[in-house]
Amino acid sequence: MSLATDSIFVTALQSNAELLYKLTESIDDDGTTVIDETPRLYGTAIGLPDEDAENVPVPYVIVTFDGLTNDQSTKDDRYESEYDTVNIGVEVTAKTLDDLHELTQMVRDTILSYLRTTDTAIQDYNFAAQQIQYDSLKPSYWQVLTYQCDVNNTNDDEQD
């Protein structure tokens, strides 16, 4: 289950229709609002289309699986501990700081609500946010939210 934790986050974000709509809107170079067919929500669970790889329209969200650890006590333990600590990154990118703040709050609220109301393997998590960055080439603002999740990695009958 630990290796699919990013899919839980993608599913959570897909459950918010308002967020998905905001991820379909963009403004082209002449200031015209453009509505795409699909939201720009990407990650290891939803690949980035090849044609967009170099120039993804803003705004977008990318969910990444950033590795895991397991607190196995010693090499002589018969089993690993029943929980993995899984790191998930959620990159939020927007055209303006106001848009970034709004999208970031929507992402945080959506994930929190989903994890509180949906039975998943995620038992608990810690949250951190990196500083806001500016990309002058795009131009856009972005921020990475990091979730460190305790994920149950065992089946009920696995350890006797």
Locate predicted features.
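Small/polar-rich, solvent-exposed N-terminal microdomains that initiate assembly or binding
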Residues: M1-T74
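Hydrophobic beta-strand residues in large extracellular and virion-surface proteins
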Residues: F9, L13, L41, V61-V63, ...
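Residue-level signal for secondary-structure boundary sites
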Residues: N70-D71, D98-L100, N153-D157
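"Short basic amphipathic alpha-helical interaction patches in structured regions
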Residues: D77-S81, L103-R108
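Oligomerization/assembly interface segments of phage tail-like spikes and tubes
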Residues: E80-D98, S140-N153
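Acidic-leaning, charged glycine-interspersed low-complexity segments
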Residues: Q105-D160
